[in-house]
Amino acid sequence: FYAAYLAKTGIVHPMQNEILASQFQDPYMVARQLLAPTNRPIFYQKHMTQHMVDGVPRAWMAHVTNVFLIRHPARVVASYAKKREGPQLDDIGYRQQAELFDHVTSLGQTPIVVDSHDIRDDPAGMMRKLCDAVGLKWDAGMLHWPSGGHASDGVWASHWYGAVHRSTGFAD
């Protein structure tokens, strides 16, 4: 929903033109794409809650397993401010995250919530719990990865994902 968010709000972001050119700007087209068959048994999607502004469809959320990754606000603000000057409350996404959590709950689902602090403290234990919660087989290989980008990274990765691209595991 990144391009749809930028198109709707008019907020200026780094790499904006590349983002707008790379994705649907119509949030209904994005939602339709999220539910399209992928010919894979597992289809991981990462969404930034701040991109889920008013008018972004929510019905698709009833058809997926929703996991909310939370992080201490001070860490979020500090990280975001390194990449974009003068962040506002809605840039961080906490209000939207609460609304999305309430929406998922209203669907009769019990959303899974994972605190990033807990993952950093006990990566293996938390990843096992998360796998159990979403019905995936645990594999210790999930704890480490090669440094660098991933084929599924968006065009914005070079700006936003520097720390992730340098990491090789949760403790990095």
Task: Report residues per predicted region.
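PAPS-dependent sulfotransferase catalytic domain
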Residues: I70, A74-L143
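A polyampholytic, Gly/Pro-enriched intrinsically disordered region
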Residues: M15-S22, Q88-I92, H159-G169
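Glycine-rich phosphate-binding loop used to anchor ATP phosphates in small-molecule kinases
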Residues: R32-G55, V114
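Short, conserved loop/helix-junction motifs that constitute active-site signature segments
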Residues: P57-H63
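Short aromatic-enriched loop/helix-cap "lid" or pocket-rim segments at secondary-structure transitions
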Residues: Y5-G10, V56, S79-A81, G125-M127, ...
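PAPS-dependent sulfotransferase catalytic core
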Residues: F1-T38, L143-D172
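A mobile, often basic/glycine-rich helix-loop segment
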Residues: N66-V67
